[in-house]
């Protein structure tokens, strides 16, 4: 008897071919329902999910098996605060005995070396030619330096990659003694393995979520970056030791050579100070024990090499000098390549977990140490940029892209932590994008040029270039405004420290209220104060102000236009623009001497200056707002000092959003724009005191400017405290 297999009925088969909801019910088989239910057009959500899936699959194919394994994912999911236990990192090191973590980089590097083939003799001669160029820059005279042979090749690529990737060294026995040569070979082999273990530690220490901070990863990253600075200090010492040996062999016998680059600390003292006072040594954290052991292993091999360079006996004649130079370049190339891995891996992705991200003090010190070493040793040691390094390494950049994509797809916006890093990266370096290299004066000039204020917006009614001058002349002929009682106005401004915003020296913008008013006993009498200070005390901040000198002004008077905005308020009446020499001398003698003193902050005051120009002017730090100044006409007011309905807000400037900071919807970064009504006719009558309203509102212009300045001062104070 034939038994029917389960699930082979006609009804079940129909359900496999047609959706069940189209078979059941009274309207089964209606064409419209079948059409809409069977439509399989891709949706935006589906496309994004598929793209993220492909990105994840591609990234997983580039990673070692342990990094994408289920065991690591389960152990990380059980941790809180995006932390990684060090035992998991050690397991990653043990699972990769053949250095699979760097296989893509090694393959690309060997391919590049194969495209530029050089024999051992050619490479040695090219290294010697570059060393003689370097030695001529540090020892300009007093040595019989050999003539530079005709260079037939550029050894930069081989110097950068070959000593690390190829096991065979150019000089295998740089010392006369066989025991010293064996110690040298063992120390170099141990240095290579120890450097690989430290790079593996950095590779496997990444948490699962790059969109959130990680405290222990930040500590480990600080330790690695501080260790990079120690490596370059040791490299400078080794190069100086080799230079001293070469100078003694080439120089006169009765001449004593001193340190070529100043006094350098012995490597043992540098290593001991780092292990005792480094980031991992001062915190007492138990999550950096394996990292400290790996760092100590590398420093131990460097100590052995330094001892050999100090005490080892070398062969005489030309061969001893050649072997000393080539072996020094090979050892330093291994150390330089190892330090480059840590710096470039940090810039490729690990910087998201660093303290202060791109402004991390250890990252800045590490890159600065690398720059100084490569600049001093030029043209011996080339440096690989982070984009070039990432194109060869492949795995780290792809992992970060795949790890950040799901969170971005889920929420539509970056996380607050990652968004803050993107803002910082978009803002550029503190000195501007062009502030690299050159003297201090060149950097100041570039800062002024890069931070020039934007062009003014479209002119408002009654604000032609001639209108401010006519209004000012007419206002000078009017009687002085009546003195307003202190109870009816806000805090009286005084001559305080310059505001923390950049001042364009070609035209003085209107003054903002000072932040720290002076006590009453330090203020001059009302009659002794200049006219501008009296008008500020009366609260007339919305009066028309000029941007430059009058057309009929004399040349000597036009020079005074380049004063800072507070310089006019610091001088008595009769001094400055439009004053006669006699009146200038008389008023200056009557004014207190301390009023002419430089306006530098006291020692206990917060430093608010970037630098000082050659003309004595201050170049101020920037805040995340673009302040666009306008010529604001006086406004009519009702009885009692109230403004007309729908009039412009009581602000002497316009807060325009900086596109580099237009990321979020918070009140701090996206202030509510006030709707400006058409301005009334030009009125030349003196204005009463303006009440300081809207100063404490969450979205008020005064509060936004105060918050921006406070955030800037806190940021600078945190940097100075490190």
Swiss-Prot record:
Superkingdom per UniProt:
Viruses
Topology in the lipid bilayer? Peripheral membrane protein
Q: Name one GO cellular component term.
A: viral tegument
InterPro entries in UniProt: Herpes_UL46
Q: Where is the composition biased (Pro residues)?
A: 510-522
Q: Does the keyword Amino-acid biosynthesis apply?
A: no
The record's subcellular location field reads: Virion tegument; Host cell membrane
Which of UniProt's keywords are assigned here?
Activator, Host cell membrane, Host membrane, Membrane, Transcription, Transcription regulation, Virion, Virion tegument
Here the segments flagged for biased composition (Low complexity) are: 523-534
On modification after translation, the UniProt record reads:
Phosphorylated by host LCK. The phosphorylation seems to be lymphocyte-specific.
Instruction: Write out the GO biological process terms.
Output: regulation of DNA-templated transcription
Coiled coil, from the record: none
For the region Disordered, give the residue spans: 423-534
Main localization of the protein described in the UniProt heading: virion
Biased-composition ranges, Basic and acidic residues, are 440-451, 474-491
**Subunit structure comment from the entry:** Interacts with VP16. Interacts with host LCK, PIK3R1, SHC1 AND GRB2; these interactions promote the activation of the PI3K/AKT pathway. Interacts with host YWHAB. Interacts with ICP0; this interaction targets UL46 for degradation by the proteasome.
Q: Which family does it belong to?
A: Belongs to the herpesviridae HHV-1 VP11/12 protein family.
Question: Briefly, what is this protein's role?
Answer: Plays a role in the activation of the host PI3K/AKT pathway to promote cell survival. Interacts with and activates host LCK and thereby recruits downstream partners SHC1, GRB2 and PI3KR1 in order to activate the PI3K pathway by phosphorylating host AKT on its activating residues. This mechanism is inhibited by the viral protein US3 that instead promotes incorporation of UL46 into virions.
Question: What's the protein called, per UniProt?
Answer: Tegument protein UL46
